[in-house]
């Protein structure tokens, strides 16, 4: 399974940086899509020369996407947003783009598609975020057979936005409480990266879905 080519969409983000380290240590070649120039210098230091190829990709330019994917054995989609902006909407990022990626994988020689969704993805959710994640899963499964979907919980680590927000709040004289007895189960980014590598190396051609919370509950009270 080694020396395969993995195209990582959104590979310059938080999870992507850890995943690239894991993959290159196992001698995978990584094609990383990123639009942010400041990330590129950092990514090039993650492996020996030739192990990483950086490509510019506008998520709405599917011709560029085809070019990035055409020689890949595995495609990993890490693209996602936590909130909408004027230019970035949940439905486009979480539903339309995964569907387009799955279709391109089906038309290429891609052997496996790893789609990272989110815990709580649900068709009937009142959250547009969770609903768009679920719809993206359906589109992916309808268009590419050999798909693994991962639903990680809140991903935490030394560079994440979630736990660092609590760290910043701790210096305030009063800390806002987001919900009494609200439970959450964050998962370490290292564990998410490990799970993706295992999904790549797992044999089989069936569509699989994994929900990945931490084994320990945490409570906001």
What function would you assign to each model-found segment?
Residues 48-99, 104-107, 119-123:
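NAD(P)H-binding glycine-rich loop region in Rossmannoid oxidoreductase-like domains
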Residues 91-95, 114, 133, 185:
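Short alpha-helix in the Rossmann-fold core of NAD(P)-dependent oxidoreductases
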Residues 117, 138-164, 168:
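Conserved beta-loop-beta element that borders a ligand/cofactor-binding pocket
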Residues 161-162, 179-200, 208, 212:
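Substrate-positioning beta->alpha
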Residues 210-221:
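Single conserved hydrophobic/aromatic residue that forms the stacking wall/gate
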């Amino acid at each position: 399974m080694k020396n395969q080519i993995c195209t990582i969409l959104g590979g310059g983000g938080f999870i992507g940086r850890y995943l690239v380290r894991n993959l290159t240590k196992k001698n995978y070649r990584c094609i990383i899509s990123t639009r942010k120039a400041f990330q590129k210098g950092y990514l090039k230091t993650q492996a020996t020369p030739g192990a990483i190829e950086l490509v510019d990709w506008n998520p709405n330019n599917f011709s560029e996407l085809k070019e990035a994917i055409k020689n890949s054995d595995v495609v990993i989609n890490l693209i996602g947003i936590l909130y909408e902006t004027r230019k970035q909407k949940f439905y486009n990022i979480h539903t339309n783009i995964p569907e387009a990626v799955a279709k391109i994988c089906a038309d290429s020689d891609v052997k496996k598609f790893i789609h990272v969704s989110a815990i709580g993805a649900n068709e009937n959710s009142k959250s547009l975020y969770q609903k768009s994640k679920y719809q993206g899963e359906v589109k992916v499964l309808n268009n590419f057979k050999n798909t693994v979907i991962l639903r990680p919980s809140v991903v935490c680590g030394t560079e994440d936005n979630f736990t660092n927000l609590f760290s910043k709040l701790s210096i305030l004289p009063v800390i806002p409480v987001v919900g009494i007895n609200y439970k959450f189960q964050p998962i370490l980014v290292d564990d998410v990266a490990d799970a993706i590598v295992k999904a790549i190396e797992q044999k089989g051609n069936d569509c699989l879905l994994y929900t990945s919370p931490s084994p320990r509950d945490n409570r906001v009270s």
